[in-house]
Every structure is written in structure tokens, then in C-alpha cells.
Amino acid sequence: MKEKKILTTIIGIASILIIALIITTNEKDIKTIETNALALSNKKIGWGIKRNDNHEQPDLGSINLKLINEYNGIAMGNKEKKYVYLTFDQGYEAGYTEKILNTLKENNVKATFFITGHYLNTQGDLVKRMIEEGHIVGNHTVNHYSMPDINDEKIKEEVMKLQTAVYEKTGYEMKYIRPPKGEYSERTLALTNQLGYTTVMWSLAYDDWDEKKQGRTEYGKAKVLDNIHPGCVILLHSTSKDNAEILDEV
């Protein structure tokens, strides 16, 4: 699986060099798999990873990898390449995204921000800034429903309504999607693929989303630096004050 221009920076640990890398989207066109989504399994699968602390790629599970690869998704990059992908989920604004964008700009780093309909409607200026500064804006659906729980037409509405709204406000065409809550099924992967999207999961995350667990900057840094690996797709939440504080250091 060739890397695409999503999410990019290199974080310096061990032998990983501290450089920035941008990979253009035209290295690999998004491939659409022709299939009847209604005939596919709708068993809900929650994305999960088995961490290690030796900076090697984690175990994502055979089912996860099989389905993500089959529908041309992304979970990790090439383990031989010394870079990582940086992604943020943007369900709502807690006041830290501006600082995150400032840090990325100061370090000449590009990232991917997966936004919801609520985020677009309430933070249109920040979304425009993301695009203007060269970041990728991805689809996290209008209402953040678990997609296996809704029917085909509702999935299409959740995805395409946000896509249309982003285009009308910014002229930007979204190509990447992250399933809300990390929950998916073979049916939902097929549907979003048929809508022209590449699904992006992750290979490193921690409980940064919990508002009650902020004020743990050393914990956050350790969770990232102890588990990072070549080709890593990092999931962070911009609602975390800790992430805004530690981003410049990690």
C-alpha cells in the first residue's frame, strides 16, 4: 500500500530523523471496489490495537487488517520508511485548535483533521485555515453516528451532506474518512469506498479525549513517544489541552 498525502510529519525518536514529509495524493488514486454492500456483513467491529514498547508496528488484528486492506484503507504506513502520519479528530471545539495549528505552522508540519458537521457549522474559520495552510480535512460524518447502526441511505446522507457543505463553504473536496467511534463493518467500508473515500484508521492513540483526564502532559508525551513506530498513524483529539501543550515537544 503506497502512502498518500495525508497527515504528515516525522517525529524524532531513536533512529527516526526529525524532518517533515509531504506525500502527494496522486501517488495512488483511490480505488473503488465494485460490490453489493447489502450482501456484505454488517457485524460491528471496533478498531483496536495491541501496543508494544519496542517501536515496532503494533498488532492490529487479522480481521482489521484484512478488511482495511481489501477496501483500500489506511492503518499504517510502510514500516521501512521513517515517518509518521499525524491526525486529529475534531468533534467539537474546546479552544485548543488554534494553538495546535500555530505549532504545526511553526514547525512546517502538515496534518489531517477529521471534522463533523457540528465542527464545520461552528468553526468554519478554523476549517478554512486548515485548508489554506495545506492540511487535509477529512470526513468524520455529519452527526458522528456509529455507521453499522444506520442504513445505507443514512450513511450516504451522513457522508455526502458534509462533503457538499465543505465544498460549498471552501471549494475543498474531501477524500478521506474516519469512521465515527472507530466502529465499522465490511458493509460500511464498502459503502464509503463506493462514495470515493479512503478510510483512515490509526496505529497509535491514547485516552486524550477524556476531559476529566487532562493535566497529564508527561503521561501524554510518554504514551506517544513510547509507542511510536515507523509508518505510525497517530490519532489525537484537539479537545485535549494536553495535546496542545505537548505537540511542540513531541
What is each PLM-predicted segment?
Residues 1-2, 175:
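Short alpha-helical segments used as structural interaction elements across diverse proteins
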Residues 4, 11-12, 147, 185, ...:
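Enrichment for repetitive, rod-forming helical segments
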Residues 9-14, 20, 223-226, 231-234, ...:
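Hydrophobic secondary-structure block in the mid-to-C-terminal portion of proteins
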Residues 51, 81-84, 94-96, 100-101, ...:
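Metal-dependent polysaccharide deacetylase catalytic core of the NodB/CE4 family, i.e.
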Residues 72-79, 107-108, 121, 242-250:
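C-terminal domain-boundary segment and adjacent tail
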